[in-house]
Amino acid sequence: MLARAPPRRPPRLVLLRLLLLHLLLLALRARCLSAEPGQGAQTWARFARAPAPEAAGLLHDTFPDGFLWAVGSAAYQTEGGWRQHGKGASIWDTFTHHSGAAPSDSPIVVAPSGAPSPPLSSTGDVASDSYNNVYRDTEGLRELGVTHYRFSISWARVLPNGTAGTPNREGLRYYRRLLERLRELGVQPVVTLYHWDLPQRLQDTYGGWANRALADHFRDYAELCFRHFGGQVKYWITIDNPYVVAWHGYATGRLAPGVRGSSRLGYLVAHNLLLAHAKVWHLYNTSFRPTQGGRVSIALSSHWINPRRMTDYNIRECQKSLDFVLGWFAKPIFIDGDYPESMKNNLSSLLPDFTESEKRLIRGTADFFALSFGPTLSFQLLDPNMKFRQLESPNLRQLLSWIDLEYNHPPIFIVENGWFVSGTTKRDDAKYMYYLKKFIMETLKAIRLDGVDVIGYTAWSLMDGFEWHRGYSIRRGLFYVDFLSQDKELLPKSSALFYQKLIEDNGFPPLPENQPLEGTFPCDFAWGVVDNYVQVDTTLSQFTDPNVYLWDVHHSKRLIKVDGVVAKKRKPYCVDFSAIRPQITLLREMRVTHFRFSLDWALILPLGNQTQVNHTVLHFYRCMISELVHANITPVVALWQPAAPHQGLPHALAKHGAWENPHTALAFADYANLCFKELGHWVNLWITMNEPNTRNMTYRAGHHLLRAHALAWHLYDDKFRAAQKGKISIALQADWIEPACPFSQNDKEVAERVLEFDIGWLAEPIFGSGDYPRVMRDWLNQKNNFLLPYFTEDEKKLVRGSFDFLAVSHYTTILVDWEKEDPMKYNDYLEVQEMTDITWLNSPSQVAVVPWGLRKVLNWLRFKYGDLPMYVTANGIDDDPHAEQDSLRIYYIKNYVNEALKAYVLDDINLCGYFAYSLSDRSAPKSGFYRYAANQFEPKPSMKHYRKIIDSNGFLGSGTLGRFCPEEYTVCTECGFFQTRKSLLVFISFLVFTFIISLALIFHYSKKGQRSYK
């Protein structure tokens, strides 16, 4: 019998190769899961340079196909039913019942009857009552059209004691009903296992998350959920916001369970949370992923931080701030299983150490990056020390880019994002809506412009609920809940309607009204520029000095005046004013056809009447205007505009009440008469008053101002129009007022009210009925304010129709809301909240850039006052004076002029001219087309851009034919005799020239002959 040979042992070399191969595979796996930490530090330098206005504004684009649109809620915030059907107590039940979570300023809620009710209970005992309203909640999801719904399971509802054992069947049934309803609607669930509501029994028995044993109990609870619900769930979140759980639950004690331990305890709890998460991830990965095919992650919250100055030190401090909040949990999971180096270097013994086996356990335990970004952590619960003296910022786009670079381009699912409004705000939540728009826009830019892999977005939250440490003092829901009602009906807010439309459009698709229009204006269109006040420099040139001087060439090298000897005085000429020619040169360089400026009443008539006329100033204006005409530039002259000091009035009038005094109107008519007589020969377009409708002007002053305008208009119409053939009107400031919530009828009414008070106040008497707007009168009577004067019938006849065209200045658009959200920006008089869309571009002085507002206000004026000839007599913005390229002004001018073109071409507005503001920085710092320094003017890039628009007479495209416009020249009336006799004058000049040459030759040769004879 042959003996069996013993099995051959693999040679030592083979074993070594297998070991090396195994190590290589582990290294490759680690490399796939990790990136070199610290790459995110590049983010600040990348975004340090201010973006071009086109990139900083709204991006008209859509999200990728298959993008996940979600909305979320949390069990304790919304479920209520805290004692129903066997639910156990959670740490939040205990925390709110014993210490109270809401701040002392919890609002007094007004019942429907109008009587004040007691403050809301500062607990989540009932909250939004979602436990008893599954159908109601899911109908809200159906209205929104979301693809995913994030909710959390209450650990204490399915396991009242927190430990594995007999589960609470009613609790399981509730979540099954919810999941089944979601399946019927085609909405995918995103389920959070732990959203801060630990069973109280586990806190009492083990000390909560401070005990490592809780990780195993959490694993058992997760296994129960995976087994019962996992077949219907593709996205799982293990723990929500571990930073808040650890730091504010066990270190500061601000949140449940309210343990005011040391920072060491906070770091220990975070350590245990990471281990608990990792165990659950491995449980799912091993036992449930093969059959259920889901994905598991942990929801990490973060702020964003900007350096105080762009120095290496400050950038390192910003990186450290993110390490201490987000990197605390993200680096162990997404990089190498260990804490950030900055934490280990700064915290020394406070930070627990991971064993090598724990590092392997934790590393790579996320199938996607679940990000939470919003007010709860980012701007309310962030520990001030973790800012490291840098500046917080609500910039989601930059945070997404940082995560992308720091953690090796993970797929990012934004699982919580939104803002909040006051607890008293009901359904018109404009502030929340615009923050939602901002965050979604930044997400879209991160995807389309930065290449970040964002797979989904979750608006927070579905409905109003209990807001943790803020109680019911704020609201974060897309649906309004009346907490005092029995049925707790969900009513969609403006934010819900906005989000529903955005999901339907899958983003912000390009719309026809957002596209630039190609086309041209009519040939006689007035292209102008504005200089509110030309610099009146009456310094005469050296040639007007009648004195005689000797040049002391041997000693002082100076001119010495010869006493008693004077030259004959000559008549002054316009060339004597050295300040005029440079301004004309600038205007000719711009190639504008019109120039608008205001006269200085106080300079011309220092005493306010014609007893003292400053003829030098008047002569300067006469020269300025006549030189404009000779340069083929049409002057547009305003008689008055409010300005400091004394509102632009002569001191004598200002000290006697200014426009409050009815005699000022008569003085204005007298002043206008002088200007018409002295300057009207060269002026075809007059403005009586430029932008008089300021909000700080009283109704009495406005009444007298209207009368003054009408007197001046009739004076011109009766005495000067026939000879001078000019036109005259008033120029009103007309910024557009837009309803903050486009879905709100209340906001539409408020916007119309503000338009009537801002524009209609002075426009309606002139261009409309001859009386003040009915809206104004009714509103003031309702407020028991009877200060608005009444016109007599004679005054109505005087004021009504006192115009030849409608002139408006337009700079920006303002949003108005009827809900009182920010007391600092609330107008109690008109009961209106002013605000802005935070996605709009803003100038350095915070003026919003909203081009479509110009088109809207022109259409509103046409609707109110008919098809009148209109001029935009001022439109412009300030820009960074230190920037070499005034790119914001270029963007502003291009888009506002294009909206004016749309009004002319598409809306058939009778638009006759457009005036850009302003000529130079000399009179309008930061707003000019020319920089001014040391008596030198330097054109900015925006000037050349505006000139190009003027040269094209609009916007020429590849398919746009330019309109042929023959060049016109201003007729010089004094030159009429010469213009009609050009040929005769040339012939006479030739004869005179020939005669002079002949005399010269005769004289020359006669002299020569005499010399020869001698």
Curated annotation (Swiss-Prot):
Its EC number is 3.2.1.31. Induction: Induced by 1,25-dihydroxyvitamin D(3) in kidney. Down-regulated by angiotensin II and up-regulated by statins through modulation of the RhoA pathway in epithelial cells (in vitro). Isoform 1 (but not isoform 2) is up-regulated by thyroid hormone in adipocytes. The gene is Kl. InterPro entries: Glyco_hydro_1, Glyco_hydro_1_N_CS, Glycoside_hydrolase_SF. Keywords: Cell membrane, Glycoprotein, Glycosidase, Hydrolase, Membrane, Repeat, Secreted, Signal, Transmembrane, Transmembrane helix. Contains 2 glycosyl hydrolase 1 regions. However, the first region lacks the essential Glu active site residue at position 241, and the second one lacks the essential Glu active site residue at position 874. Residues 517-955 are annotated as: Glycosyl hydrolase-1 2. Disulfide bonds: none annotated. The keyword Transport does not apply. One of its GO terms (biological process) is norepinephrine biosynthetic process. One of its GO terms (cellular component) is apical plasma membrane. GO terms for molecular function: beta-glucuronidase activity; fibroblast growth factor binding; fibroblast growth factor receptor binding. Optimum pH is 5.5. This is Klotho. May have weak glycosidase activity towards glucuronylated steroids. However, it lacks essential active site Glu residues at positions 241 and 874, suggesting it may be inactive as a glycosidase in vivo. May be involved in the regulation of calcium and phosphorus homeostasis by inhibiting the synthesis of active vitamin D. Essential factor for the specific interaction between FGF23 and FGFR1. The chain crosses the membrane at residues 983-1003. It catalyses: a beta-D-glucuronoside + H2O = D-glucuronate + an alcohol. PANTHER family: GLYCOSYL HYDROLASE, KLOTHO.
